[in-house]
């Protein structure tokens, strides 16, 4: 750089530091790059599809999909995983529909979960921002964007038009929350619903509520869909679920994860572990028999799941190996669970 330009730059940087504080402007190479902390989603397959082993802390996340597709289940599992690692979590229940007993079944410590049921959208987002700014919260869930009703709409008449009020509210709130979340390393997950655009001839007519602001501010956007049923005999015990990573600022996007959500239990974590271990040749499969490090561990997938339930240390060791292999080397295309054997038989725990 020219000497005069260099002096001018130094003078400008000194003035900026004096006015706004140290490290307001810095050279990118001066600081060592720190790995982004991730919170597991409770599904190993989805953690791998996200590329960093889970959802990133300090970022805005959007999870959207049709009704009863597993959106709240996914966020409650993320809360449970965050609490296991010593984190403090909050759930802003704008829909007034949180079931404490179901949350407990998914592993959430409900005695230490902060819950708020706000009266209107402004109150919900103000509470979220204050919790983020406190620096004491690791994960906040807002359920859901569609239920963040502006105060003017609540106080108005039923037939009144309130065009764009919710979109403006979300845009204003996200401008504040995004920077605060990064500074306090707090993850904020927004659950969103799907609506249909009228008169769309080409392309998908689906859109999410709350305007476009959340689409821009979110570092990760997950589209969750129920694609089938899980049966045990004639009884339906869960749903086959597909999650597409629609947007990902942390790793390559557009990967997919297919896994099972069992009613009242959450994701079929050990079932995923068995399939991924076979896929990565960590566990060997010959006919119906599965073996690990030369020792047979079970005949049939359900017996292997039972073996992992009884030998948690081995299950954790295999999971670590899978994460090391797939998150280091990366995966191409969709990360899927292919259930070759016993497709509709699941272990009742």
Swiss-Prot record:
The family database entries (InterPro entries) matched by this protein are listed as: AAA+_ATPase, DNA_recomb/repair_RecA, DNA_recomb/repair_RecA_CS, P-loop_NTPase, RecA-like_C, RecA-like_N, RecA_ATP-bd, RecA_C_sf
Q: In which compartments does the protein localize?
A: Cytoplasm
One example of a Gene Ontology biological process annotation: DNA repair
PROSITE patterns assigned to the protein according to its UniProt record, in alphabetical order: RECA_1 (PS00321), RECA_2 (PS50162), RECA_3 (PS50163)
Q: Tell me the SMART domains matching this sequence.
A: AAA (SM00382)
Xref: Gene3D superfamilies: P-loop containing nucleotide triphosphate hydrolases
GO molecular function (one): ATP-dependent DNA damage sensor activity
Q: Which domain of life is it from?
A: Bacteria
Q: Which residues bind ATP?
A: 65-72
SUPFAM superfamilies reported for this sequence: P-loop containing nucleoside triphosphate hydrolases, RecA protein, C-terminal domain
What is the protein's known function?
Can catalyze the hydrolysis of ATP in the presence of single-stranded DNA, the ATP-dependent uptake of single-stranded DNA by duplex DNA, and the ATP-dependent hybridization of homologous single-stranded DNAs. It interacts with LexA causing its activation and leading to its autocatalytic cleavage.
Family of this protein = Belongs to the RecA family.
**NCBIfam families for this protein:** tigrfam_recA (TIGR02012)
Q: Which PANTHER family match?
A: MITOCHONDRIAL DNA REPAIR PROTEIN RECA HOMOLOG-RELATED, RECA
**Name of the protein in question:** Protein RecA
Organism, per UniProt? Acinetobacter baumannii (strain ATCC 17978 / DSM 105126 / CIP 53.77 / LMG 1025 / NCDC KC755 / 5377)
Q: Which gene encodes it?
A: recA
